[in-house]
């Protein structure tokens, strides 16, 4: 008989203030949200998780999932976001959100996580393309911070060199 997974609990949203907004390439940008002291426990996360952001675009409220690039020890929520085209809702998000604005952000979720093994010697290889690099940045930052014996290798592809998001962080 199949073992059924428990139903996921409904995501809880909280208003978070945008602390930083940065255009990375023509088609990607990063957002960084402050976590108020009262919500620190709600936003405790593991590297590799994601959040859902609610934002208005063209008269409709969108909900999109974005992987975090921040590591747990940083105590902030940083996201990498791709703009698919000029008419996309993510283009509106970039154009219309400013530092200091508040946005509904879900508590972290997702199971693309790793068990930390700080006392072991191990090698981890990551593969990513385009904006798919975001959860790996979170993982690699966390591993570099907590696992001194772990070796990291990354294979990362993009169509064009000018489309490399987070170039400074990964070089």
In which residue ranges do the predicted regions lie?
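Conserved S-adenosyl-L-methionine
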Residues: 120-121, 142-152
């Amino acid at each position: 008989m199949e073992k059924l997974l428990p139903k996921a609990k409904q995501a809880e949203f909280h208003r978070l203030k945008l602390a930083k907004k940065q255009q990375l390439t023509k088609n990607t940008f990063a957002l960084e949200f402050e976590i108020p002291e009262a919500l620190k426990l709600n936003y405790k996360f593991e590297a590799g998780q994601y959040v859902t952001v609610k934002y208005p675009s063209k008269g409709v409220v969108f909900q999109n999932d974005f992987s975090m690039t921040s590591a747990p020890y940083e105590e902030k929520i940083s996201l990498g976001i791709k703009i698919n085209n000029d008419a996309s809702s993510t283009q509106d998000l970039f154009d219309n959100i400013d530092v200091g604005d508040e946005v509904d952000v879900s508590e972290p979720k997702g199971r693309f996580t790793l068990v930390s093994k700080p006392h072991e010697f191990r090698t981890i290889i990551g593969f990513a393309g385009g904006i798919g690099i975001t959860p790996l940045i979170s993982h690699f930052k966390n591993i570099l911070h907590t696992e001194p014996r772990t070796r990291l290798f990354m294979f990362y592809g993009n169509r064009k060199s000018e489309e490399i998001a987070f170039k400074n962080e990964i070089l």
